[in-house]
């Protein structure tokens, strides 16, 4: 276990920030908490004390339960959450998720060795056991029969007294592996049971195992897009509906989602992060003393874990009790309309899209109040909810205006003179009204913060929170679905099965057997010879659905005409070789199409071979006319042909030109037909080029225009080409191969994440 991280603690570290270290009793927390029944609290504390402390690990064997030794009371020898140095925001968020599993999930980003997984497993070990209905495949709660899976109501068992049979199990902890298929995630046909019974029997997936527990996804940014979308759809709905392979089944799925990822290995798509309530970073800076303490406690844990468990035993037990009691308080916590208005205004000022920010923030604020043993939401709860939910989603203003000192409003004019008796009566009334107003204002001050975290321009008022928000901005991905995978039925990684469309190239044996399993009993009865053990018919056949990483194709369209042609060709050659040298892992391909004279030619077809590129680019032809339209149209043809081959997901054309053309497209494609035709005007040539640029945009191809025209004679037409094609434009009259390569890589990176 890699415990030498910067987020591990020393010397009796605290699980919670100082304000929430202990769960307050009703008599000491707030007036609302004081009104809670004392017998209720005593009963809950007794239940918490008598509950078994073990926790359950998933039946998939991801985390086996430990036995014996000093750590047996904690399950396996996890690193206790109370021993983690710092990371108060993340630890608070994890406790909130333990209190309310349906809070919306928690995403933790951070570099390697920042205790992301350590904290997730540490929280799981603190969760109390759960009561489930005997025979349930999805950990059904006996108190909520309306949420049971289909068919369970007809299969439940009762004891001699007529009571529903239940059992106490450890809280599930299910980890989603990166290579998981949809069948294993949502469930599929149980082949063995279906063969024996002759009917279709459902085999639950990991989502059924995770219900009412913890669903942990490590490196969610590397999870397959289809799987991640399916996963979050099910968690959002709270129910898994399976309609496939003759199965029609549904079961509840409401676990606590904890997702972790390293932003250096790829960002998470923005729409996925938007569907997770709390998004925090573990990369916050630590002091020198904290880093020393982290190494110290990690070393102690490796040498003697019993001592570390003993150090934080009190903190851990308090937190366990706090979770149990807070779950009961949460049922009675209320949030006022004025408080909701405050959260909505913060979300608006922060530039949050949609309504998820304020919805999640309201739920978090209620959980914070329940954690303190209160039935009302206070100011600190609202502020903390904004920091945990709204702040990471905010769109920071690039140039926030400095706050100006606001002048107080002028005093009202003095009232007109009145007689003494009426003045005394009015003074008495005003004193009574003032007392009522003071009481109301005092109560109101406890519920609504005096100032917003965001100012009217979207900037952050509290400078201490600026770094926290900037971390969220850096790890935020971009919207959209990237074409980084190519799906086929013959090459790649097996990700699922599908009904065949024509001849089957690769048979999905597992899916075929699942489809045939329910009919084995009937087919055996019809078989008179009794010679076969498994009967598979053509209608049972399933083909493999494969996926492989798709590279991008960069097509350099280079103006090889004029006096500067040789420089442009040399720079394009250098940029192409630089891209090829770095394209081994990304599978990117490069092509070069120079245009000169009357037409363009493919000097280097799409290739990943550096040797081939050097051989093809050894001689660089230059001089002659400038058939720009033919160069761009040739690039479109090459790109579309490469896309049809199935090896390219994205196409980008890099046009290195001054935008000046003097050869028409018709002359390039059919020189004999235009031999006697009059020479086209400059405007006709421009219209022809812009028409080709429009076709580039319609074909879904990205265009990067590098303008090499001298600024003293510039016409700006190269920029117009980029505008029509919805592409990017750089004015680089003296660009070197390194500059062109850097500009291309930047545009290519944006293209892949768009």
From Swiss-Prot:
Query: In what ranges is there compositional bias, type Acidic residues?
Result: 421-443
Where does this protein chiefly localize?
plastid
Q: Give one GO molecular function term.
A: magnesium chelatase activity
Question: Where does this polypeptide localize?
Answer: Plastid, Chloroplast
Here the segments flagged for biased composition (Low complexity) are: 1-14, 24-41
Transit peptide: give start and end: 1-45
Describe what happens without this gene: Homozygous KO plants are chlorotic lethal.
Which top EC class applies here?
ligase
Q: Does the keyword Plastid apply?
A: yes
* One GO BP: photosynthesis
In this chain, composition skew of type Pro residues spans 407-418
Ranges of residues in domain VWFA:
553-751
Protein's name in the database: Magnesium-chelatase subunit ChlD, chloroplastic
The organism named in the record is Oryza sativa subsp. japonica (Rice)
Name the gene for this chain: CHLD
């Amino acid at each position: 276990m890699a415990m030498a991280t910067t987020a591990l603690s020393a010397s009796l570290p605290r699980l919670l920030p100082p304000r929430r270290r202990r769960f307050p009793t009703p008599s000491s927390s707030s007036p609302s908490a004081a009104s809670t029944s004392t017998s209720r609290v005593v009963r809950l504390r007794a239940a918490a004390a008598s509950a078994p402390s073990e926790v359950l690990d998933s039946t998939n064997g991801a985390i086996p339960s430990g036995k014996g030794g000093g750590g047996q009371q904690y399950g396996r020898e996890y690193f206790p959450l109370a021993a983690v140095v710092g990371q108060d925001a993340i630890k608070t968020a994890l406790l909130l998720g333990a209190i309310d599993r349906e809070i919306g999930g928690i995403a933790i980003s951070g570099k390697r060795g920042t205790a992301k997984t350590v904290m997730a497993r540490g929280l799981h070990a603190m969760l109390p056991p759960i009561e489930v209905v005997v025979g349930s495949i999805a950990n059904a709660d006996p108190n909520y029969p309306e949420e049971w899976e289909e068919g369970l109501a007809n299969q439940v068992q009762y004891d001699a007294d007529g009571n529903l049979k239940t059992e106490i199990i450890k809280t599930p902890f299910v980890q989603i592996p990166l290579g998981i298929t949809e069948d294993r995630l949502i469930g599929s046909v149980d082949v063995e049971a279906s063969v024996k019974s002759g009917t279709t029997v459902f085999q639950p997936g990991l989502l059924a195992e995770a219900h009412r527990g913890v669903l942990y996804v490590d490196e969610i940014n590397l999870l397959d897009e289809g799987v991640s979308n399916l996963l979050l759809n099910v968690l959002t709905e709270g129910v898994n509906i399976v309609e496939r392979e003759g199965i029609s089944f549904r079961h509840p799925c409401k676990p606590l989602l904890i997702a972790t990822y390293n932003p250096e290995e790829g960002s998470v798509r923005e729409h996925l992060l938007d569907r997770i309530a709390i998004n925090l970073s573990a990369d916050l800076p630590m002091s020198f003393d904290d880093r020393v303490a982290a190494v110290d406690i990690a070393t102690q844990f490796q040498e003697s874990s019993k001592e570390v468990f003993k150090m934080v035993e009190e903190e851990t037990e308090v937190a366990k009790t706090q979770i149990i009691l807070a779950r009961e308080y949460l049922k009675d916590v209320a949030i006022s309309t004025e408080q909701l208005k405050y959260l909505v205004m913060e979300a608006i000022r922060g530039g949050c899209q949609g309504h998820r920010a304020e919805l999640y923030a309201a739920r978090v604020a209620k959980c914070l109040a329940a954690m303190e043993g209160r039935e009302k939401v206070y100011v600190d709860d609202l502020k903390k909810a904004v920091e945990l939910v709204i702040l990471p989603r905010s769109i920071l203003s690039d140039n926030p205006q400095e706050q100006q000192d606001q002048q107080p409003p002028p005093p009202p004019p003095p009232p007109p003179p009145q007689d003494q008796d009426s003045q005394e009566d009015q003074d008495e009334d005003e004193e009574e009204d003032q007392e009522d107003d003071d009481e109301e204002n005092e109560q109101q001050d406890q519920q609504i913060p005096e100032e917003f975290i965001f100012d009217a321009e979207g900037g952050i008022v509290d400078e201490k929170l600026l770094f926290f928000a900037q971390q969220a901005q850096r790890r935020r991905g971009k919207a959209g679905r990237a074409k980084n995978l190519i799906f086929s039925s013959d090459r790649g990684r097996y990700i699922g099965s599908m009904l065949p469309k024509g001849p089957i190239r690769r048979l999905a044996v597992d899916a075929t057997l699942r489809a045939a399993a329910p009919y084995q009993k009937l087919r055996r009865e019809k078989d008179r010879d009794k010679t076969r053990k498994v009967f598979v018919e053509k209608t049972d056949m399933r083909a493999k659905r494969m996926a492989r990483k798709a590279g991008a194709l960069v097509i350099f369209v280079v103006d090889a005409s004029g006096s500067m042609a040789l420089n442009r060709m040399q720079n394009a050659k250098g940029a192409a070789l630089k891209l090829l040298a770095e394209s081994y892992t990304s599978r990117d391909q490069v092509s070069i199409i120079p245009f000169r004279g009357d037409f363009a030619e493919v000097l280097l077809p799409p290739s990943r071979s550096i040797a081939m590129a050097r051989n093809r680019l050894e001689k660089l032809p230059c001089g002659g006319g400038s058939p720009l339209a033919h160069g761009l149209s040739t690039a479109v043809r090459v790109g579309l042909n490469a896309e049809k081959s199935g090896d390219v997901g994205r196409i980008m054309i890099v046009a290195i030109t001054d935008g000046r053309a003097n050869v028409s497209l018709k002359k390039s494609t059919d020189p004999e037909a235009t031999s006697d035709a009059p020479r086209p005007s400059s405007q006709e040539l421009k219209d022809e080029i812009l028409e080709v640029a429009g076709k580039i945009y319609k074909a879904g191809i990205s265009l990067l225009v590098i303008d090499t025209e001298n600024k003293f004679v510039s016409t700006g037409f190269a920029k117009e080409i980029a505008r029509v094609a919805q592409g990017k434009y750089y004015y680089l009259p003296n660009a070197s191969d390194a500059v062109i390569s850097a500009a291309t890589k930047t545009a290519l990176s944006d293209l892949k994440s768009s």
